[in-house]
């Protein structure tokens, strides 16, 4: 493996004179839709903007430049972007607002047509984020949809005051599920150099970060595209030995979730025993139409291996309900899979047809009322399992990363190593950080606890489940 010499984002500052503020810094506002990868990319470009002399502001009204980081995985975020761009165009006509668009939707013809319609000035695909300095210097409409190799080379500065952070380790996806647009928008898998990953994590550690999440469309494939790179299991061991108290990863693919990964988790205390393993459907017939490359038996065998090596593992999954051609019998197989696995958590979605995918081209969609009805049944099934699993934690002491105020009055909220949301009395955890918490009560969606050794709080009415 050749050496890699990491460098931080440090472009020379450049900014035009803002209207009405000659000589002042231009102001930018970033709006992010979608996954944690998009959140990481937004942090990266925010760092770019600051290094260029821009000021980041909290609202569209304050901004000279609004950059929208888009998602194209489902139809709902696409429509949100369409609506937002319509509003931004009015601001552009009124006061000369500069509009930028990045992310997965920008890579698609659908997004590019939106950009033309709504007067987008800067359009960057997910692989072209490092073109931003050039785009802002152009002083004219700038579009870049290339996949630049240097997009993986930059190390953004640690987010100020953050206790947790994301670190991208691989971009793109080599799987071609028939419903998914990601291989089109983000390209094939490209692993980031391990020197860069470790350098970024070391900087986060020095900045006080106590929890790092390794990100990728398929983190399990890390290193396979680059001879001499460590495997994902080896990378987990390396990161787990750096002194960061908590290490997580997202997202995995059942085909690539191999035994050596399970062993690395079991043998590395810093790796959280929270495993998100998307199944999408419990029906082999539907999995075949989805081109998921595994079948129910293989998935359940992976779950068995995980349970054997990690009996305290917390499992979550993704489910698509109402995929084209899904029958009631197919759906019943998904429900029965739930009972075999007993997921702690699940992210459940109605199938959303995406232009450009094989499923969109070749399969006829199911009636919406059928999809909604099945989703409601699945949600009830998951609610039952979540409550059952959460009750198992009552009376146990867990480590909770408290991050800030909860919506529930009198509480602060954090999450344990199993990614359960945990509420504790605000008086017991006055500042964000890691606390030992005894779980006192559970609902299907929340755990309630008290900080070990803290003075008993005055009774606080618990929210109704």
From Swiss-Prot:
UniProt EC number: 2.8.4.3
CDD domains: Radical_SAM
Cofactor(s) essential for the protein: [4Fe-4S] cluster
InterPro entries tied to this protein: Elp3/MiaA/NifB-like_rSAM, Methylthiotransferase, Methylthiotransferase_CS, Methylthiotransferase_N, Methylthiotransferase_N_sf, MiaB_methiolase, rSAM, rSAM_horseshoe
Location of the protein in the cell: Cytoplasm
Record keywords, A-Z: 4Fe-4S, Cytoplasm, Iron, Iron-sulfur, Metal-binding, S-adenosyl-L-methionine, Transferase, tRNA processing
Keyword Iron-sulfur: yes
GO molecular function term, any single one: 4 iron, 4 sulfur cluster binding
Gene Ontology CC entries for this record: cytosol
SMART domains, per the entry: Elp3
Disulphide bonds in the chain: none
Keyword Cell wall biogenesis/degradation: no
Residue ranges constituting the MTTase N-terminal domain according to the UniProt record: 26-141
Signal peptide start-end: none
Record note on cofactor: Binds 2 [4Fe-4S] clusters. One cluster is coordinated with 3 cysteines and an exchangeable S-adenosyl-L-methionine.
Stretches assigned to the TRAM domain: 391-453
NCBIfam families referenced in this protein's UniProt entry, alphabetically: miaB-methiolase, MiaB/RimO family radical SAM methylthiotransferase
Similarity comment text for this entry: Belongs to the methylthiotransferase family. MiaB subfamily.
Role this protein plays: Catalyzes the methylthiolation of N6-(dimethylallyl)adenosine (i(6)A), leading to the formation of 2-methylthio-N6-(dimethylallyl)adenosine (ms(2)i(6)A) at position 37 in tRNAs that read codons beginning with uridine.
Oligomeric form and interacting partners: Monomer.
Name listed for the protein in its UniProt record: tRNA-2-methylthio-N(6)-dimethylallyladenosine synthase
Organism, scientific name: Thermus thermophilus (strain ATCC 27634 / DSM 579 / HB8)
Taxonomic lineage of the native organism: Bacteria, Thermotogati, Deinococcota, Deinococci, Thermales
Primary gene name: miaB
């Amino acid at each position: 493996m050749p050496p890699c010499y990491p460098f931080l984002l440090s472009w020379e500052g450049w900014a035009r004179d803002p209207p009405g503020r000659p000589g002042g810094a231009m102001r930018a506002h970033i709006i992010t839709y979608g996954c944690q990868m998009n959140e990481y990319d937004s942090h990266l470009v925010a760092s770019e903007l600051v290094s260029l002399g821009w000021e980041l502001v909290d609202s569209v009204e304050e901004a000279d430049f609004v950059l929208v980081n888009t998602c194209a995985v489902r139809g709902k975020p696409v429509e949100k972007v369409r609506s937002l761009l319509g509003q931004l165009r009015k601001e552009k006509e009124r006061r000369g607002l500069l509009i930028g668009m990045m992310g997965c939707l920008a890579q698609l013809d659908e997004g590019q047509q939106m950009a033309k319609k709504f007067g987008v000035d800067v359009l960057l695909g997910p692989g072209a984020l490092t073109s931003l300095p050039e785009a802002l210097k152009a002083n004219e409409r700038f579009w870049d949809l290339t996949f630049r190799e240097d997009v993986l080379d930059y190390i953004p500065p640690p987010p100020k005051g953050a206790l947790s952070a994301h670190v991208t380790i691989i971009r793109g996806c080599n799987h071609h599920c028939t419903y998914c647009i990601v291989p089109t928008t983000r390209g094939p898998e490209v692993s980031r150099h391990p020197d860069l990953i470790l350098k970024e994590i070391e900087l986060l550690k020095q900045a006080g970060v106590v929890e790092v999440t390794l990100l990728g469309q398929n983190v399990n494939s890390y290193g396979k595209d680059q001879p001499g790179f460590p495997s994902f299991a080896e990378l987990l061991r390396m990161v787990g030995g750096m002194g960061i108290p908590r290490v997580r990863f997202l997202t995995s693919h059942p085909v690539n979730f191999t035994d050596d990964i399970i062993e690395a988790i079991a043998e590395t205390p810093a790796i959280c025993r929270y495993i998100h393993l998307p199944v999408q459907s419990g029906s082999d017939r539907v999995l075949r139409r989805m081109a998921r490359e595994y079948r129910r038996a293989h998935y359940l065998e992976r779950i068995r291996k995980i349970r054997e090596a990690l009996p305290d593992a917390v499992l979550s999954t993704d489910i698509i309900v109402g995929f084209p051609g899904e029958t009631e019998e197919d759906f019943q197989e998904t429900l029965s899979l739930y009972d075999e696995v007993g997921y702690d958590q699940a992210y459940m979605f109605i199938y959303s047809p995406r232009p450009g995918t094989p499923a969109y081209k070749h399969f006829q969609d199911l009636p919406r009322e059928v999809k909604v009805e099945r989703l409601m049944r699945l949600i009830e099934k998951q609610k039952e399992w979540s409550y059952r699993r959460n009750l198992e934690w009552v009376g146990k002491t867990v480590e909770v990363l408290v991050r800030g105020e909860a919506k529930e009055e009198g509480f602060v909220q954090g999450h344990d190593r199993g990614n359960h949301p945990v509420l504790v009395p605000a008086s017991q955890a006055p500042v964000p950080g890691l606390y030992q918490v005894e779980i006192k009560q559970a609902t299907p969606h929340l755990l309630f606890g008290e900080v070990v050794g803290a003075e008993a709080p005055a009774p606080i009415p618990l929210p109704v489940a």
